[in-house]
C-alpha cells in the first residue's frame, strides 16, 4: 500500500485501466473422473469423502483458479504459503472462515497431506491442470 499511496489519481486510473485490459486466465477443465496419480491429486481433485474432506476444486474452482472472494486461487501460490495457511487452520490460529469450512478440512489432513496438496497446487500455473 505505500506505493499506492504515492500515486496520483491520474496514475491510479492509468494502472486500473492497464490491469482491466489484461486478459483473465481461462480455466482449463479438470478431468476428475480420471484416476489421480498420487494422494495429493486425489485430495485436490476428488477429496477424501470417507473422512468428510471435499475435493479442493469443488470450492476453489477448476484447476484451483479460485471462485470469487470466498474461495481464493490455490494454483500457482507458493507451496510454503499454502502449507502455512493450512497449518494455521489446523492449529486454530486462522479464524477468517465464518463457517470454519477450512478449519474442519485442514484439521482432517495429516502434516504430509498438507505439504503434498500445497506442493500440488504450487505446481499449477492457474492455466493448466494435470489430473
Can you annotate each of these PLM segments?
Residues 1-7, 57, 61-91, 103-108:
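Gly/Gly-Pro-rich "capping" loops immediately C-terminal to redox-active cysteine motifs
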Residues 1-29:
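Hydrophobic, ordered structural segments
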Residues 2, 10, 14, 39-43, ...:
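Extracytoplasmic/secreted proteins, especially bacterial periplasmic and envelope-associated proteins
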Residues 11, 44-49, 54-57, 111-113:
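C-type cytochrome heme-c attachment and multiheme electron-transfer modules
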Residues 11-14, 24-25, 49-52, 65-67, ...:
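Short loop/beta submotifs within extracellular cysteine-rich repeat domains
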Residues 15, 53-63, 117:
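The canonical Cys-X-X-Cys-His
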Residues 21-49, 126, 131:
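Electrostatic cytochrome c docking/interface patches
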Residues 80-84, 88, 93-131:
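C-terminal functional regions that serve as terminal interaction/effector modules
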Amino acid at each position: 500500500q505505500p506505493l499506492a499511496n504515492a500515486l496520483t489519481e491520474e496514475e491510479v486510473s492509468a494502472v486500473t485501466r492497464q490491469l482491466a485490459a489484461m486478459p483473465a486466465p481461462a480455466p482449463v477443465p479438470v478431468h476428475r473422473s480420471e484416476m489421480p496419480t498420487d494422494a495429493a491429486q486425489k485430495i485436490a481433485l476428488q477429496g477424501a469423502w470417507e473422512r468428510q474432506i471435499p475435493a479442493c476444486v469443488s470450492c476453489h474452482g477448476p484447476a484451483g483458479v479460485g471462485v470469487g472472494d470466498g474461495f481464493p486461487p490455490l494454483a500457482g501460490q507458493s507451496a510454503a504459503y499454502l502449507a502455512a495457511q493450512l497449518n494455521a487452520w489446523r492449529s486454530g490460529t486462522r479464524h477468517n472462515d465464518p463457517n470454519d469450512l477450512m478449519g474442519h478440512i485442514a484439521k482432517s489432513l495429516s502434516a504430509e497431506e498438507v505439504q503434498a496438496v500445497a506442493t500440488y497446487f504450487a505446481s499449477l500455473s492457474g492455466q493448466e491442470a494435470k489430473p
